[in-house]
Amino acid sequence: MASSSAKILLPLSLLFTLLSLSQSTNPNFILTLVNNCPYTIWPAIQPNAGHPVLERGGFTLHSLTHRSFPAPNAHWSGRIWARTGCNYQHGKFYCATGDCGGRIECDGLGGAAPATLAQFVLHHGHADFSTYGVSLVDGFNIPLTVTPHEGKGVCPVVGCRANLLESCPAVLQFRSHGGHGPVVGCKSACEAFKSDEFCCRNHYNSPQTCKPSSYSQFFKHACPATFTYAHDSPSLMHECSSPRELKVIFCH
């Protein structure tokens, strides 16, 4: 769901310094997904190329429940998001936001924009670092935070707690039922206008030419600790050494 495509992609520039594997890993490291929303969601997990699919790539998570599972015990990178408004239509599974090709188990497929995205690079560097961040580059569909537990270092909680559906500018609103239903997502400017400037493509594909817009500033003002455009500050990815758990909380 990167920009104008229907895939969620971790910005490659954030991975260049994260490629060395750690020498030892925490054998009890787990990932936990928590649904604090007053409705059911369908979390999805997509690995980057060459890494294994976790939990078959997606599942149902009812309101006020959680699901924990072992983190990979070797270097892994990928992304997690929530699908919302899912049901069966004419015998086919479909989600209003974050849909991954009409299936409950995404099995490595990316999701459709807009969707709030948690990004991870696990087990890298000399101190078994896990790096994590939250991106609104491809829009917003649900509040989401990442909380590390029992790691070494600063290990901050990051993410977007605000419900941007209530304040999303009209031009960015994404509505269900073919655009005639309620607002279920807030699109990025790239998704809304498809321009090279907003999508940071071609001439604009560099830190010097890809700049924040009034639309990305809307996201940044509401959720300052998130990525809001393609060349936003790499410092928004945070490192935590040997955490016991990384917890993704929807509707914190």
From Swiss-Prot:
It is found in: Secreted, Cell wall. Keywords: Cell wall, Secreted, Signal. PROSITE patterns: THAUMATIN_1 (PS00316), THAUMATIN_2 (PS51367). GO terms for biological process: defense response. GO terms for cellular component: extracellular region. Gene3D superfamilies: Thaumatin. InterPro entries: Osmotin/thaumatin-like_sf, Thaumatin, Thaumatin_CS. Residues 1-24 form the signal peptide. Its main location: secreted. This is Osmotin-like protein. It comes from Solanum lycopersicum.
